[in-house]
Curated annotation (Swiss-Prot):
The modification N-acetylmethionine is found at M1. GO terms for biological process: cellular response to growth factor stimulus; negative regulation of canonical Wnt signaling pathway; negative regulation of fibroblast proliferation; nuclear membrane organization; positive regulation of protein export from nucleus; skeletal muscle cell differentiation. It is found in: Nucleus inner membrane; Nucleus outer membrane. Interacts with lamins A and C, BANF1, GMCL, BCLAF1 and YTHDC1/YT521. Interacts with TMEM43; the interaction retains emerin in the inner nuclear membrane. Interacts with ACTB, SPTAN1, F-actin, CTNNB1 and beta-tubulin. Interacts with SUN1 and SUN2. Interacts with TMEM201. Interacts with NEMP1. This is Emerin. Residues 168-187 are annotated as: Interaction with CTNNB1. The modification Phosphoserine is found at S8, S29, S54, S72, S88, S99, S141, S142, S171, S174, S176. Pfam families: LEM. The keyword Ribonucleoprotein does not apply. It is a single-pass membrane protein. The chain crosses the membrane at residues 224-244. It comes from Mus musculus. Disruption phenotype: Early and highly significant depletion of primordial follicles.
């Protein structure tokens, strides 16, 4: 692995792309991991290739960072050998799918062949998950549409139900005089008569009269009116005052003496 330590970050990224190894930005903490992956890849490659292969040894020469002359024939492997290599390594397909889709190669564009080769292992799983999510979304959307249709049947007959005035019952005379045709009556259409919600609105009592109802009931329960109670209180007070003055007159002044 010492041979990879002399490579720069750009050169190491080129080797990773050449071997179709997914990678992210090369920093100090991830460089050792990528060097280890390249070393394992080279080891497996030597086992799969014939002994007399000229590409068994690792030789990577760069003349300049801007103009990198890489022998492509040395690192190009057939697709069959690549498949055998990854199967022998027992890599996790989910890891390759996630790492390739979430990471981005910095510095150089990605090749189309790499994206196809790494997306193939998880294509069936992604398609299955997408299908299940689509079916679930369709079910939820159908349920929402059914709920909206029910609301339209109940509340869609007129837009005046949102007002607080529908809680106040109005007689037929006042309704006809005011010209309020949106209150359901006994001669409504078949749609309004079939629904029980509009008829239940009229049976509700008014909000404000309910708050005033206890006071009205208290006034009806009184046997003596309020003015009568005040009159009795004044008479009783006058009687007590008369008794007090009469007692004071009988006792008289204790310092007063008869001549």
């Amino acid at each position: 692995m010492d041979d990879y330590a002399v490579l720069s970050d750009t050169e190491l990224a080129a080797v990773l792309r050449q071997y179709n190894i997914p990678h992210g930005p090369i920093v100090g903490s991830t460089r050792k991991l990528y060097e280890k992956k390249i070393f394992e890849y080279e080891t497996q490659r030597r086992r799969l290739l014939p002994p007399n292969s000229s590409s068994s040894s690792f030789s990577y020469q760069f003349s300049d960072l801007d103009s990198a002359a890489v022998d492509s024939d040395m690192y190009d492997l057939p697709k069959k050998e690549d498949a055998l290599l990854y199967q022998s390594k027992d890599y996790n397909d989910d890891y390759y799918e996630e790492s390739y889709l979430t990471t981005k190669t910095y510095g150089e564009p990605e090749s189309v062949g790499m994206s196809k080769s790494f997306r193939q292992p998880g294509t069936s799983l992604v398609d299955a998950d997408t299908f299940h999510h689509q079916v679930r979304d369709d079910i939820f959307s159908s349920l929402e549409e059914e709920g909206k249709d029910r609301e339209r049947l109940i509340y869609g007959q007129d837009s005046a139900y949102q007002s607080i005035a529908h809680y106040r019952p109005i007689s037929n005379v006042s309704r006809s005089s005011l010209g309020l045709s949106y209150y359901p009556t006994s001669s409504t259409s078949s749609v309004s008569s079939s629904s029980s919600s509009p008829s239940s609105w009229l049976t509700r009592r008014a909000i404000r009269p309910e708050k005033q109802a206890p006071a009205a009931a208290l006034g009806q329960d009184r046997q003596v009116p309020l003015w009568g109670q005040l009159l009795l209180f004044l008479v009783f007070a006058a009687f007590l005052l008369f008794v007090y003055y009469s007692i004071q007159a009988e006792e008289g002044n204790p310092f007063w003496m008869d001549p």
